[in-house]
From Swiss-Prot:
Classification of source organism: Eukaryota, Metazoa, Chordata, Craniata, Vertebrata
PROSITE patterns recorded: OCEL (PS51980)
A Pfam family reported for this protein in Swiss-Prot or TrEMBL: ELL
Entry protein name: RNA polymerase II elongation factor ELL3
Reported function: Enhancer-binding elongation factor that specifically binds enhancers in embryonic stem cells (ES cells), marks them, and is required for their future activation during stem cell specification. Elongation factor component of the super elongation complex (SEC), a complex required to increase the catalytic rate of RNA polymerase II transcription by suppressing transient pausing by the polymerase at multiple sites along the DNA. Component of the little elongation complex (LEC), a complex required to regulate small nuclear RNA (snRNA) gene transcription by RNA polymerase II and III.
Subunit structure: Interacts with AFF4. Component of the super elongation complex (SEC), at least composed of EAF1, EAF2, CDK9, MLLT3/AF9, AFF (AFF1 or AFF4), the P-TEFb complex and ELL (ELL, ELL2 or ELL3). Component of the little elongation complex (LEC), at least composed of ELL (ELL, ELL2 or ELL3), ZC3H8, ICE1 and ICE2.
Start-end of Basic and acidic residues biased regions: 130-140
Gene Ontology terms describing biological process: positive regulation of transcription by RNA polymerase II; positive regulation of transcription elongation by RNA polymerase II; regulation of epithelial to mesenchymal transition; snRNA transcription by RNA polymerase II; stem cell differentiation; transcription by RNA polymerase II; transcription elongation by RNA polymerase II
InterPro entries, alphabetized: ELL/occludin, ELL_N, Occludin_ELL
Length: 395
């Protein structure tokens, strides 16, 4: 991760010395991922990586923090079928001299780590984080989906090796790779509580907290965060997008998908509506997750919740970051009178930016639908767990 010590100039000799049985990847990552990797190297801890097809997760563990990134592997450096690729060349000091370079092998694939990072810091870490860090440029959403059309399949669930608990708090250590955007997402999620419940009213401890080490008391902050993780879901990142102002065909078609209602929470009306649907229209999670009747069933539901929640948070961060620019433009349109030249110019600007956005982020629709699906599924599971705990507390 260190740059060259001196500039290369003059005539250079290139030697081909590829390493045997070694695959080389071109790594593309943002500053947050780089800082987290550097911190892992400094702490001498090994990152955990999980592949499934061309996608995967990268977890960077630390003593009191944990960062979770998503990535995709794609072809790199080719101008077309059979076109020239990229080679990894290094300058090795020694008897060969400074003007001798060594080619270690071709770079056929690129591993891109998304700028949208999923991390779970403790509240004390958030309060002590350096607030002078520059905010991400508003145009950075264009780099969120830089991958080919063939890689637009939705993310599927995948297992990861065990890493230290990301909810463990630290009173004096900030989270490497965090930013104000992630702190804002954390605050929004913590402020989104269940309906008909006082924000200050604590939920009953769930079965997942029974597995806390009984040899020492669990920190109050960790228990509270585990409760919030079960009881709160971030509001849909798709709310606030315009739904009727634009007349362009491409944007109108997307608006039909963007016109989402308020976020779904567990309620009797939701279950009543689902019962009137045909079997083909009923979501699979309504058939799979019925009322809970035992502690073992509750524990299984909680495990499924945690598994889907990790994927949901990554997708939510990506979709929210991609949608934020259009939410800002829609807010500008609301402040301009319809029919005026300013309104038409702004409308044209949104259409053009949207067309460029579709090319840069071809998998946006699929990830958006997957994010909404997980949001509704997690809300359903959460409601069943709370309903079971409420029933047991009253008996």
């Amino acid at each position: 991760m260190e740059g060259p010590q001196e500039l290369l100039s003059g005539k250079l000799r290139l030697c081909f010395t590829p390493a045997a049985r070694t695959s080389l990847l071109l790594l593309k990552l943002n500053d947050a991922a780089l800082r987290a990797l550097q911190e892992c190297h400094r702490q001498q801890v090994r990152p955990v990586i999980a592949f499934q097809g061309n996608r995967g997760y990268l977890r960077l563990p630390g003593p009191h923090w944990s960062c979770l990134f998503s990535f995709i592997v794609s072809q790199c450096g080719q101008e077309g079928p059979g076109g020239p690729g990229l080679d990894l060349v290094c300058q090795c000091p020694g008897r060969s001299g400074p003007n001798r370079l060594h080619c270690l092998g071709p770079l056929r694939e690129r591993l891109t780590i998304w700028a949208a990072m999923d991390s779970i810091p403790a509240p004390s870490s958030l309060q002590r984080h350096n607030r002078t860090e520059d905010a991400r440029d508003r145009e950075s959403w264009q780099n969120v989906g830089d991958y080919p059309e063939a890689d637009t399949i939705s993310q599927s669930q995948m297992g990861l090796e065990e890493v230290p608990d990301p909810l463990a708090s630290s009173q004096g250590q900030s989270l490497p790779g965090s930013s104000r955007e992630h702190m804002a997402q954390w605050e929004v999620r913590n402020q989104t509580l269940l309906p008909n419940r006082d924000p200050d009213q604590a939920l009953p401890p769930s079965a997942s907290q029974k597995h806390v080490d009984k040899k020492r008391p669990a920190p109050a902050a960790m228990v509270e965060l585990k409760q919030k993780r079960l009881r709160t879901l971030a509001p849909s990142p798709l709310q606030g997008l315009p739904s009727q102002d634009l007349q362009e065909e491409d944007w109108e078609q997307e608006d039909k998908d963007e016109d989402m209602g308020p976020r779904l929470e567990h309620s009797p009306s939701v279950q009543a509506d689902s019962e009137s649907l045909s079997p083909e229209e009923v979501p699979d999670y309504l058939l799979q997750y019925r009322a809970i009747h035992s502690a073992e069933q509750q524990h299984a539901y909680e495990q499924d919740f945690e598994t889907d929640y990790a994927e949901y948070r990554i997708l939510h961060a990506r979709v929210a970051a991609a949608s934020q620019r259009f939410i800002e433009l829609a807010a500008e349109m609301n402040n301009v009178q319809r029919g005026t030249p300013e309104h038409k110019a702004l409308e044209e600007k949104i259409v053009q930016e949207y067309k460029k956005f579709r090319k840069r982020y071809p998998g946006y629709r699929e990830e958006k639908r997957r994010c909404e699906y997980l949001h509704q599924k997690l809300s359903h599971i959460k409601g069943l767990i709370l309903e079971f705990e409420e029933k047991n507390r009253g008996s």
